[in-house]
């Protein structure tokens, strides 16, 4: 009993210190589904541990948000006209088309499909956002709650409008967006196309002349033809709600902080702004012990070790033909294989391969017997592999996955294959390469050391910036003046025009003076001749 009393007293003391120091705040969260939520939840758990009150806005159609009883996180559920299966089918249909109907390496096929999906998704987000903003009871409750900051994922628009209506600071958390459009046009980030490969281009930093041409064409396409959601509709909606002309990008530009889920172990060097910071790998942690059955299987591999294979949480199965191509290659490995797979058991499955509906991926990648990781290139899995120093075989499917694998290949830590066209021999040779060529393991370990050699852990950095914004009631002192300029002022076209006009006028006056002098001299000469 005394021990319990002491524990309670210590807890109360900790809470009292937190409140007395004024460091505890109230965070309102506007989230996004799937892996976006997994990353966001990691930040929210850390905020709760720091004593902050976290409230997540979730619709009644949410797929994974709040699906488990997350301790310490409050959920404010609002009704939406959409059903959960409608939203889920929309995403699954997109995933299926991206995997089986188009080639990720065919830009125009991928961009065209992504454009259609973004426009449809934009309409869904707008409807859901309206159901929140026009819900007077909910909005009154949010205003009375006196939140200190909105933490939002800009891939799901609406958070910026909430922050504006509640008159509180805004912090974004995201991995990226097609063509870096949100970071560039919403955040004011400078991305020179001469050496910064645009997102979804699949290009590296050391670009040839033709690759730079290709990169510039991609930039122009994204800037002028690709939608940043259904921008006109969002502009109109935001203007109606706020009662003044305003644009979607203008409100995005008011964000106090952009927390980008990346880091220099993955990215190529490029410019950043003061209110941008990298928090990539925030979910990574030291490996925990495996379940006993799984540990026994891993240990049975002996000195050969194991290969971990997962295509992420959104891809549960494959076609029978592709599954058998993969199974045939895996069966020829001396290593044991742990494959996350929910489809029909492949006929070619070898005795060295076990199928699992779920695997503790981080713990497996951190196991000393793990030799390689077969991945679709999702940022979460790539960062876990970097964290533990595991070389990869990449089978990118959609989104930023191609870029992630291309970056890892350029850094000598991965081999890239095409899931739709590869043969069993291709996969087998790729695995043998990353396992038997020591340079891949060495490069992976180099990236791991870079990742671990940070003054502050990524998760701690994310929490710091959110608390920083709450403490200072924003971070406008980190926001560049570019947001206050028109497009022609930003590119100094007015200054260039003024200077050209000055040069033209000066040139005109000089020429005019020369002509006058010439005429005067010529006239004087003729007069002398007549005299």
From Swiss-Prot:
Coiled coil: none annotated. It is an enzyme of class 2 (transferase). Keywords: Endoplasmic reticulum, Glycoprotein, Glycosyltransferase, Membrane, Microsome, Signal, Transferase, Transmembrane, Transmembrane helix. The keyword Transcription regulation does not apply. Its EC number is 2.4.1.17. Glycans are attached at residues 69, 101, 317. InterPro entries: UDP-glycosyltransferase (IPR050271), UDP_glucos_trans (IPR002213), UDP_glycos_trans_CS (IPR035595). The chain crosses the membrane at residues 495-511. This is UDP-glucuronosyltransferase 2B13. It comes from Oryctolagus cuniculus (Rabbit).
